[in-house]
């Protein structure tokens, strides 16, 4: 039996926060899901699966939230476990306890392992500093999600672009500064949840690359500029290095290769 079940649209770099930590710490996960469009015909439940006609009449119909259009089929049990009704949605093995938001799901995986590797810091001070970086990522994550959805739907405006550009610069400056002076990790002297979170969020934002031409036709410069290595050298090198790590590579490498192929078209 898995120690944690996760339901989400796939692929989803924010799920990597859990899968990477699970590989590092030896936690057994059960990940279920499908492409965003397919989830409209899924039953949103602990036992998430493609929806049958009979189940469709029993499940609650809720209008789609960010990233989804139309109605979604959510059971009462799903909504009780996940009051905000969003994915990724994690569950305890019995399905009674719901855990939501990717950073919290990642923390849960570390806790399930007893965190023998110090992924959540070696003491309360480091743990709190890690939390600080995770909280900072939430500001960038919110803006990046709105930005990428607008870019994909052709509804991008300067009101969305400007704040996202600024949020990206703020986030990357903070990460780059934390990695300056020869530091190998964002917090302390070992790999932590802060590093895992950074890799996931930066990889997700790379979905801007295939839309670079669309941006330029609107008179906007890609936020992921060609000078990224010069602007944030430590952060970019850190991402490249961790992408090759055995716990990261199974998620990161195929995803980034797919983005590069789409960008080259």
Enumerate the language-model features and the residues they cover.
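GST-like domain detector, emphasizing the conserved glutathione-binding G-site
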Residues: 1-165
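GST-like fold's C-terminal all-alpha helical module
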Residues: 121-240
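Primarily interfacial, aromatic-capped hydrophobic alpha-helices that serve as membrane anchors
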Residues: 240, 244-250
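C-terminal helix/juxtamembrane-tail motif
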Residues: 248-265
